[in-house]
Amino acid sequence: MVTQLTKNAIDSLINSTNPDEQYVIQVLKAPQSVAENLFKICISDGFCKFKKGYFVSDAATKCQDLKDLCIIKCKKYIDDSNHDKERIIISNYELIYSNIQEQIGKPIEYKQYKSSGFSNPEGSTVIPSQYLSRNAQILQQNQVSQPKQMVTPPVSNINKPTPAVNNTFAQKPAVTNQNIQRVNQNPQQMNKTAPVKQNNNNNNNNNGNNKNNSSLQISTDGDEQNLEYIRNLQPNGQPQTIKVRITKKGDLKSFKEKQGKLFSIDVIDKFGDECSISFFNEIAEQYDGLFKVGQVIVLKQFSVKVNNNHQYNKGDHTVTVNKESKILICQEDPSIPMIKLNRQFIQDMQNKQKGDLIDLIVVVKADTEVKTMILKKDNQQQSKRDIISFDESLIETEITLWGETAKDYDAKQGDIIVFKDAKIGEFKDKKQINIGYGTQIFMNPDEQLFPQIHDVKKWYLSLNSDQLSTIQKAQGNDTGPREVTSFESSLNILKEEIKNLQTDPEMKIWKEIRGQIMYIKDTPLYYNACFSCKKKIARNNEVWTCINCNKDFNEPDSRYILSLNISDSTDTIWVSAFDEVGQKILGVKGDVFRYADEDTEHGTETKKKLLMAAQNKEYRFLLLTKQERDQNGNARDKTVIHAIKDFQPAYEAKKIINSLEKFMVIEENNP
């Protein structure tokens, strides 16, 4: 009997230190499909956790029913230790325990664990004994064998008290990871009929949150006669029946102002018409977890209302499941499309209104590092990442990801992303693309799911440097400032383009430069800021006072305002860098330099060592150059490091290889 996880399994799997060892690990989050036969997982060995784990091959074909916190034995994995990025690729596994309801130990992030000398005082590999005695057998994977299955919630649970749920329903959609659903992109996997949960007759109490879906009744006595199409639904109270495919499933959420719960699914019928189906309160509890994206279902006896909220619901009408409703889970029906994409281009957003939805297929130009933002609404921290992308309209735009999605984003330059139901926003009279409540993101999706991908790839491979140099920033109107952007460039080209600022002072220039830091000015390095508004604050006796927020602090937040000289093989230039980039360059927070300034004995030497250590290092810089005016109205050109990435020789070599391959494709197409 397996009684514990394998200590340091994560590090061993990453470095392939013992290929014959079968490591026991915990899957913290259920596998998430990211491409055909590829599932992403977050795993733990009790001492550290790792987000970039993947199931491929045999593991990918059987992993869809794995639950959060289950324990598996890694039987086969791929030696990927020579790859430039740390990741774990598992090709086969054995399920050990599926009934685990808690995290084993208190694992920390792998990088933190590694930097601390593989030490974590709160880590543990011991599996609690109650799980060993209760269910030591592997749960069998239930496959649907009937052509159709009738799913109805158990009557005995209708009046069951609702367990407490985190109050996330009313939170701002754009900053919650639950708003963005990464949909199964493998058409073969989407075609599979998902198994219905059946009664396992175990005594798990599920910590009081067991929805008891295991007692659902299964029947095959339904039929598909008198089907109605979504476009013909009527809110007349008469019985209606529809046959649809699930294209999106939302999470179970709770209301803010009154007790209650909700989840919804988006569906599509054979004509490509869409609508949203909602489940409320005890009905939501009973059906939550039963559906999977790609399933074909028949729904009978439901309520229909006119859709008055197109921001959250699809179609002209909304459907609500009630106690009399019946749902049949059907076999695959190829006449019903997988998903509907009303593709438009970045330039089309100028003709849309704020709040409108748009479907885009874009090519990644660059992405910034994950940043931490303080939300003004509640002073809570949120992670964000900006994706700079473009399409065939040769216009680029920034699309911002928030929360865990920003942290998990793993695409690179040239990758293709599909945004379904992105939301048109507006900031300072300029249109922008926002990630809304119902936005779906597909990273490098299969061409079978979106046939348009083939044409986009072909177009991207055919681009030459002259065409790339004409890509412009999307603007809110034709009279707005012009922005010039290119992929990889050099400092001598940047300096030539800066001359154009004399005739077009509103222009902004974006360049990605591979260069190194030559010198960092030692004063000023930072300013003392308020923790809330980030504005400059002054010392008042023993406290620091923010006039803007009317708050006092024992210490300030020392934030970088660096001035540094960078160079490449063509030229040098003075640039500015602010706090997040400064921390990346110097490796410490600005507070360290403030402490050094206060240390009259050793402070000067400490500052000198830190600054010297940061010089002569090579990076990839994303630079923004624009013209600014000082208090006297004098114009000056200013270049700021917008983002920075470590120089990776293996990645640079791959870029050269990719460029050669792209050139060969162009040569073949243009003999």
UniProtKB/Swiss-Prot annotation:
Keywords (A to Z) from UniProt: DNA-binding, Metal-binding, Zinc, Zinc-finger
Designated name of the protein: Replication protein A 70 kDa DNA-binding subunit
Feature: DNA-binding region: 240-322
Listed SUPFAM superfamilies: Nucleic acid-binding proteins
Gene Ontology annotations for the cellular component aspect, listed alphabetically: DNA replication factor A complex
Known function: As part of the heterotrimeric replication protein A (RPA) complex, binds and stabilizes single-stranded DNA intermediates, that form during DNA replication or upon DNA stress. It prevents their reannealing and in parallel, recruits and activates different proteins and complexes involved in DNA metabolism. Thereby, it plays an essential role both in DNA replication and the cellular response to DNA damage. In the cellular response to DNA damage, the RPA complex controls DNA repair and DNA damage checkpoint activation.
An example molecular function term from Gene Ontology annotations: DNA binding
Chain spans, region Disordered: 143-166, 190-219
The protein's assembly and partners: Component of the replication protein A complex (RPA), a heterotrimeric complex composed of RPA1, RPA2/TEB2 and RPA3/TEB3.
Transmembrane listed as a keyword: no
Organism of origin: Tetrahymena thermophila (strain SB210)
Pfam families named among the record's database cross-references: Rep_fac-A_C, REPA_OB_2
InterPro entries given in the database record: Euk_RPA1_DBD_C (IPR047192), NA-bd_OB-fold (IPR012340), Rep_factor-A_C (IPR013955), REPA_OB_2 (IPR031657)
Family: Belongs to the replication factor A protein 1 family.
Zinc finger (C4-type): 530-549
Biased composition (Low complexity): 199-213
